[in-house]
Amino acid sequence: MSKRTFQPSNLSRKRTHGFRARMATKNGRQVLSRRRAKGRYRLTV
C-alpha cells in the first residue's frame, strides 16, 4: 500500500499557488491572464 500523498497545509498551498506567488514570476502572470480571459470565478486558490 502506498501512503496518501496529499497532506493539506494552507501555508504551503498559498506559497506555491497563491496570488502573490503567481504575480512573482512572468509565467505566473501569464497563468492569471489566461484565467481572466477564460472568465474563471477564482483566479487563485
UniProtKB/Swiss-Prot annotation:
- Region: Disordered, residue numbers: 1-45
- State the Gene Ontology terms under molecular function: structural constituent of ribosome
Its GO CC terms are: ribonucleoprotein complex; ribosome
> Tell me, what is an example of a GO biological process annotation in this record?
translation
Pfam families in alphabetical order: Ribosomal_L34
Which HAMAP family does the entry link to? Ribosomal_bL34
What's the protein name?
Large ribosomal subunit protein bL34
